[in-house]
Amino acid sequence: MKKIFFILTAFVSTIGFAQNDITICHTSATDKFAVFASNKDFNTDHPSPLAYVHESEAGGEMIKLKTATGMEANAYLIKAKTKTDNWVFVFQEWWGLNDHIKREAENLYNDLGNVNVLALDMYDGKLATDPQAAGKYMGEFKQDRGTEIVNGAIAYVGKSAKVATIGWCFGGGQSMQASLTAGKQAVACVIYYGMPEGDVERLKTLNCDVLDIWPTKDGWINKDVTEKFEKDMAAAGKKLTVKSYDADHAFANPSNPKYNKEFTADANKNTLEFFKARLK
């Protein structure tokens, strides 16, 4: 038993500290990213977010979503001024559905025009204000519950809805998973430095194009991860556009010391163009 414990411990440590060699077989994309939660360097790269209280000018409000198990989910909703089937699902960073994400949701709402925006609470009400709590919540997250929340959101928006997804960091991976879950209703997927799906057979079921915002200095979603994603998408016969920036992980977060205003503006421009071309 002691030998088995040692082997498992060494395996986890190798994953946590050798991101340049991430080749975890038969491990879900969500679990791969969750390994980072226990890595001190990853925690250091994510300093506590600045205090911010969002006051919506677009009528944003928290709502409850029904799910298949009966356990309700939370979401932040901004409804279009004119009825439309265009929806954008927004996915949080590892902090949770905080006011920074609500602000990003409202920015998308304002920039895209006639669209509904739904930011999903993947932590069921838990919010982190420091890396230790964020790592704990991300490590505890179960993809089954995440998929349940997304299915609840899809049921809420209806069968005629066209669903685009976007997320950052932890939420980047969840954006990918949500687009896979949405099936034929998925029309666009944007990933900001998140863990992509690595199962080619799953990728073959994807119904939309993907825009991957990738910072080349990212030590977590690194070159090996990105190049594998490109190969996997090609093997699945799906369209992937990678926009690379000479920046570090979380460069688009204004609360991060490595925030790059110029690159963030360009990434946002590419994101809006990508969405507008597919949300018609």
Predicted regions: what they are:
Residues 206, 212-214:
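Short beta-strand/loop motif that positions the catalytic acidic residue
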Residues 104, 222-232:
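Short alpha-helix in the alpha/beta-hydrolase fold that links the catalytic acid
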Residues 21-45, 49-56, 61-156:
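Serine-hydrolase catalytic machinery in alpha/beta-hydrolase-like enzymes
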Residues 167-171, 175:
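Gly/Ala-rich beta-loop-alpha elbow adjacent to hydrolase catalytic centers
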Residues 157-168:
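Alpha/beta-hydrolase fold nucleophile elbow
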Residues 184-195:
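A conserved short beta-strand
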Residues 236-280:
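C-terminal catalytic histidine-bearing segment of alpha/beta-hydrolase fold enzymes
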Residues 217-221:
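Acidic catalytic loop of the alpha/beta-hydrolase fold
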